[in-house]
Amino acid sequence: MYVEIMDGFLDKNQLVRFNSVYEQGKWVDGEISGPKDKEKKNNLQNEDYDVKRLINQEIHKLFRQLSNYYNINRASDVLILKYEKDMHYNDHVDYMQMHGIRTDYTCVLNLNDDYEGGEHYIKNHKGEKTLYKLKAGDMMMYDTSQIHGVNPVIEGERRTLTFWCESAVNDIGMREALVRFNVWYHKLTDDDYDALGYKKWCELDWIRMQIMRNHVHYRD
C-alpha cells in the first residue's frame, strides 16, 4: 500500500492565500460529481469558475516540484471540497479515469486542521482502516486503486483540495519502485557522492537512466 505524506506542501503564506480564495464562490452538493455518489458521499463542492481557475493555476505550479520524484505526465483539475458537521464520504474507489486522465495517484491537500473527526482513511486487503489526520498545508498522495473514504466530521469544518495524477510509468510495481528510488536518489548529499566515488556514482546514474528510458513514457 503506497501512501506518501508531504509535510508543509503549502507554507503559511500560501495557506492564507488559498483559504482566502476558498471562501469565495458558490457551494453545491458534492453529488454533482456523479449520479451514484448520493449514496456514498455527503460533502460540498465549490463550482465557482473563477475560484476553480485560480486554485488550479496555483496547484499546478506547485506540483511541478514533484516531477523529479513521481514521473507525472499530467494532473487533473482540482476538486474544492468542504465537509461540515456530520458530513462524510463512505468506502469507495476512485474512477480509473478522471477529467480526461488515467488516475494513478490521488492527492488530498488539507487547508485547515481545526476540526474534529473527518479523518481520511485507506483500507487494506483485509478491510482494516488506516486513519490520516493531516495538518493544515500537508498533502497525502496514494495509489488511486485503494479503497478509501472520510469519517464523519464531529465538530468544525474540513477544507480540502483533491486532484489526480497520471504517471508516466504504466506498471504499478515499477511505478512504486521508481518513486522510492528517486526519493532516495535526490536526497544524496555531497558527502554521499564522496563516499561512493565518481566511478560508482556514474554507474548508479547510468542504471537509473536505463530504468527510466525503458519504463518512463511522457506524453507530448
Role assignments for model-derived ranges:
Residues R64-V179:
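Catalytic core of non-heme Fe(II) oxygenases with the double-stranded beta-helix
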Residues M1-I72, A177-D220:
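Non-heme Fe(II)/2-oxoglutarate
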